Amino acid sequence: MEDLCVANTLFALNLFKHLAKASPTQNLFLSPWSISSTMAMVYMGSRGSTEDQMAKVLQFNEVGANAVTPMTPENFTSCGFMQQIQKGSYPDAILQAQAADKIHSSFRSLSSAINASTGNYLLESVNKLFGEKSASFREEYIRLCQKYYSSEPQAVDFLECAEEARKKINSWVKTQTKGKIPNLLPEGSVDGDTRMVLVNAVYFKGKWKTPFEKKLNGLYPFRVNSAQRTPVQMMYLREKLNIGYIEDLKAQILELPYAGDVSMFLLLPDEIADVSTGLELLESEITYDKLNKWTSKDKMAEDEVEVYIPQFKLEEHYELRSILRSMGMEDAFNKGRANFSGMSERNDLFLSEVFHQAMVDVNEEGTEAAAGTGGVMTGRTGHGGPQFVADHPFLFLIMHKITNCILFFGRFSSP
């Protein structure tokens, strides 16, 4: 499972950088873990170069590389395994089946670990693969989806009734999200040429370990860039927290723990250097190794910190086909080259689109029951410790501390 968390972080950072480049000044919020786990269900049915490209983009080679566990009898029934043996690639088939089993077993274990403590926070994720009904999913593929992901693909009639299929998918998502997401697939997003779409929606709402005080009186200016100001409702907290400073990037990093095993990490540049968000250097420099270093106990120390962050709610919708293709996942979206023979004997499926929607509430949750009053934004008396004043764009990530898995990654650049 540790290897999978490394893979997910690598994928998260790469995906975020591609989205950030495509939308340099907009708010961003996504769940790389949720996207990766949903894509893994598709990956399980891929073969050939389609499989290789998906593994590379999703960083699954980081997981399968160390798979040395003995084969168990049920693994021998994996989709496509017997076909490979018949082609004379017996040793390769065993290694591939071992690696695949490790990937999907790790996702099952990771999901169990993340969902184990959801009594302290709300994490709702909806994942589903919808395929053209004429394709006929393999029974073995359906069984493995149920085994590893507690889900299964659903057949719909894209060919003859695309609009009806879209409404059916939206109705299913709306029901699963208790009405939070009523229209995940917009009009015109599917048609008679659609063969397979992947839907993924996730919502997070956590309770802070130490609640913020009630909202500060009045609105405060949020510096969108060096020239633009937007009024925003700020929240205040004075608490012992882990805080660090990234010297070469001139940025602070702060950990805000939620109740349970989840924390939010905020990365805040000292100042805005130009007319954009001021996050360009931070976004270009962030890597897996650097993030591990920045969030380590060696670089972060507990101190009594005064924290000012805006109250915000993000609800972001993405159609990820173009981004995933730019990352190297070409064949899966190509009608002529896609190989999903592990899903369907006819092998005429290709991925038309990946729809992802993520939502988060960041507020003073729990303050109504806490003693505390509002106040001014600076100049609190009797405090000589550091301040963390997020009155300009910042990056944030929500991490499951037990597994070090990034559940969400975001950029807040404009209220």
UniProtKB/Swiss-Prot annotation:
This is Plasminogen activator inhibitor 2. Pfam families: Serpin (PF00079). The record marks 380-381 as: Reactive bond. Glycans are attached at residues 75, 115, 339. Interacts with PSMB1. Inhibits urokinase-type plasminogen activator. The monocyte derived PAI-2 is distinct from the endothelial cell-derived PAI-1. The signal sequence is not cleaved. It is found in: Cytoplasm; Secreted, Extracellular space. It comes from Homo sapiens (Human). It comes from the Eukaryota. InterPro entries: PAI-2 (IPR015556), Serpin_CS (IPR023795), Serpin_dom (IPR023796), Serpin_fam (IPR000215), Serpin_sf (IPR036186), Serpin_sf_1 (IPR042178), Serpin_sf_2 (IPR042185).
